[in-house]
Amino acid sequence: MSQIPDIKPGQSVELLQELHILTRDGKLNQDSRRKLKQVYHLYHFIEPLLQDVLAAGNGLTLADHGAGKSYLGFILYDLFFKALDQGHIYGIETREELVQKSHELAERLGFGRMSFLNLSVEQSISSPELPQQIDIVTALHACNTATDDAIRFGLAKRAKHLVLVPCCQAEVASVLRKHKNQSFGKTPLSELWRPPIHTREFGSQITNVLRCLLLEAHGYAVTVTELVGWEHSMKNELIVASYKGAARGNARQRSEQILHELNLDEMHERFVY
């Protein structure tokens, strides 16, 4: 139990040390205080979603896709799930050594309702180790197409909420770059990504725009905001999607128009389904 200022009551000091949020002697330095601020700010967005699912009375399942070292899952368990007599967190990761380390840490901490699965995207959608429906899907700093993988997983699992912090959206930028000369003759909008730095930044932005449209086309209300304390990073965009049932009528059409206008037709399968 923690009595350290700045740390929420009841948090596991051992966990925070394992996650390098606390130093080995249980102290907060400037860097770890920044990390803690980031974690708590992200939790501020996720906690109401957890409460929403819990209030429905049908249990609570959360899958962290591309979990890495599963620090988000551990923090959520420590702050929310630990005090409950129900709920389960699944960490999905393709690197077996990280899955094993997370499993060992959960056992050591007594976090009994956490599972760590060494599965690919396609495997995770159909694996019997996961329930047919997952309430909340998270993907933190999921690189390149990993955010899209998490969205596909969330849609397949009929998730009530998705919480996404995308990272390194390089694929769309590479397609913009490949067709740059052709685009110059097609649309004046190509000026938006003419310099290489603009290609990278515009590619990242349009990737997330297309992701939001995809979610809206599947009946989700989407909000996009900035994470406080992550300003030093380009990876500070937070996408939260909550299922409402009514699809935005023109979302699919908008996606198709954007892909065509920007010479990204080859990415249709990734963003329109």
Task: Please give the residue ranges for each predicted region.
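Class I S-adenosyl-L-methionine
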Residues: 1-18, 24-25, 29-34, 40, ...
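Conserved alpha-helix/loop element of class I SAM-dependent methyltransferases that forms part
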Residues: 38-58
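Secondary-structure boundary elements
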Residues: 48-52, 82-86, 108-112, 156
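Conserved class I S-adenosyl-L-methionine
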Residues: 58-68
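Phosphate-coordination loops involved in phosphoryl transfer and adenosine-cofactor binding
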Residues: 59, 86, 134
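Conserved SAM-binding loop of SAM-dependent methyltransferases across substrates and taxa
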Residues: 69-84
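Conserved SAM-binding motif I beta-strand of class I
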Residues: 88-93
